[in-house]
Amino acid sequence: MIRFKKTKLIASIAMALCLFSQPVISFSKDITDKNQSIDSGISSLSYNRNEVLASNGDKIESFVPKEGKKTGNKFIVVERQKRSLTTSPVDISIIDSVNDRTYPGALQLADKAFVENRPTILMVKRKPININIDLPGLKGENSIKVDDPTYGKVSGAIDELVSKWNEKYSSTHTLPARTQYSESMVYSKSQISSALNVNAKVLENSLGVDFNAVANNEKKVMILAYKQIFYTVSADLPKNPSDLFDDSVTFNDLKQKGVSNEAPPLMVSNVAYGRTIYVKLETTSSSKDVQAAFKALIKNTDIKNSQQYKDIYENSSFTAVVLGGDAQEHNKVVTKDFDEIRKVIKDNATFSTKNPAYPISYTSVFLKDNSVAAVHNKTDYIETTSTEYSKGKINLDHSGAYVAQFEVAWDEVSYDKEGNEVLTHKTWDGNYQDKTAHYSTVIPLEANARNIRIKARECTGLAWEWWRDVISEYDVPLTNNINVSIWGTTLYPGSSITYN
């Protein structure tokens, strides 16, 4: 009887255990199925990462290659050439409006909004993530776990790591200088966005870049971008996409949030913190040497007194905008003295509690394979160069002991509506008239004079060579003063052409 009771008790316990374990096994299987659905769903997404993040800017089919215009004593030839620019940046500039969409560990969609630097955030329940900071000295203290990786909580965790470094290690460790520099002339919004990897609206709003004036050749603008990185914060990459999502999330949930072949999911893998300085060099000069003058000014502190570029610098202004660091001190500086800009760049170059870092750029990866999400920019733009010509004159002087004749001719250039060169031939009304010494005159030339031809001949009195050339020059350059002199005798004539 006792043996029977024991057997019955064991059977009851076994049955209870089976009933208890069944929900656990079922629940565990449900979680596994959800994780597998996310991993297999993201893995099965079909897309070309180069195409899904392609940015096709301006497409230029036709343009006027050349035009000329007279302004006062000047003739300005505007020459346009079609250029193409292709870039594939992996570090994307951060602007204030997207801070809460570009923090370490943030989930995004690789869609058109991402290409335009206004990423779409993928809002779902998340698993904890680890973020790491590369400040020197922290060693094993450089990482922190964020249980619910929202923008606010990740920002708080980063502040905690930075505060720890400031309190314990800033006095014994210095930050290595990591500076990125880029520059470009401005031709269009798409071109400058691709060249500097920054949203053109940022430059338009913060620096006041007048793209219409640039397009109309009323102004020439160069933009400099200085990025000084104080530290970088990275999020651990997942072994599987499902490692990022709460166990309650399914692949269907992700699809409802916008995940598709056209918009695969991304994660912000790292964010660089520091400060960015944008500098605008702007001039109303139409000289073809503007770019060379600006580059010389950037490299050489003494070049501003150079006579070579004096006219350009006198008609230039400079603007600097600082993002990050102690930006209250140098939020925006507008000046005609480039030394003031140098001071802005030099000041506050060291990270401290009084000179904090600012998120300046980020890199994202595709969840499917952790490959870097590079935006592929391709745009056409028109590169415009201006050549300025001034009026000139020909000074004829005849002091020779003989009868002389002159021939002066030139072409005046203009351009039709299609940009084709149109030449109008001009001649001096004193051509081939006998002139005896001493004779002098001035022949004015318009600023659009080209193909200048100057000829002078003397009467020898010889039956077999009645006229002999003293000067015969083609393609004489247009200058302020073209001095043409002839002298001597019929047997020994002399001549010269000088310019000033």
Swiss-Prot record:
Keywords, sorted A to Z: Cytolysis, Hemolysis, Host cell membrane, Host membrane, Lipid-binding, Membrane, Secreted, Signal, Toxin, Transmembrane, Transmembrane beta strand, Virulence
Membrane disposition: Multi-pass membrane protein
Motif (Cholesterol binding): 490-491
Pfam families: Thiol_cytolys_C, Thiol_cytolysin
PROSITE patterns (alphabetical): THIOL_CYTOLYSINS (PS00481)
Motif Conserved undecapeptide: chain residues: 458-468
Protein name per Swiss-Prot or TrEMBL: Perfringolysin O
Lineage, uppermost ranks: Bacteria, Bacillati, Bacillota, Clostridia, Eubacteriales
